[in-house]
Amino acid sequence: MGKESGWDSGRAAVAAVVGGVVAVGTVLVALSAMGFTSVGIAASSIAAKMMSTAAIANGGGVAAGSLVAILQSVGAAGLSVTSKVIGGFAGTALGAWLGSPPSS
């Protein structure tokens, strides 16, 4: 599939790169917007509501390894290299798929 078919194969490559960068770059922004910040959970945020719900459901504490605990950890410390690589691959695959030519 080259220019003769009306499709620029570079478009899929650009979409793949953009997808990978966006996938990794938006994680911390999204978590911060939810209230999982580098200094802890922000008051009156979605994160605070999630933590309250998890604590009530668990008898007063948030269980280690729960979704809230994991998101709090990522919000405070950032993503590990492995998580960035996995997220980058997922974003790259999605970007390549979205940038590919439509099926005939």
Swiss-Prot record:
The gene is IFI27L1. One of its GO terms (molecular function) is molecular adaptor activity. PANTHER family: INTERFERON ALPHA-INDUCIBLE PROTEIN 27 (PTHR16932), INTERFERON ALPHA-INDUCIBLE PROTEIN 27-LIKE PROTEIN 1 (PTHR16932:SF36). The chain crosses the membrane at residues 14-34, 59-79, 81-101. Plays a role in the apoptotic process and has a pro-apoptotic activity. Keywords: Apoptosis, Membrane, Transmembrane, Transmembrane helix. GO terms for biological process: apoptotic process; intrinsic apoptotic signaling pathway. It is found in: Membrane. It is a multi-pass membrane protein. It comes from Homo sapiens. It comes from the Eukaryota. This is Interferon alpha-inducible protein 27-like protein 1. Belongs to the IFI6/IFI27 family. The keyword Transmembrane applies. Induction: Not up-regulated by type-I interferon. It holds the Pfam family Ifi-6-16. GO terms for cellular component: mitochondrial membrane. Gene3D superfamilies: 6.10.110.10. Signal peptide: none annotated.
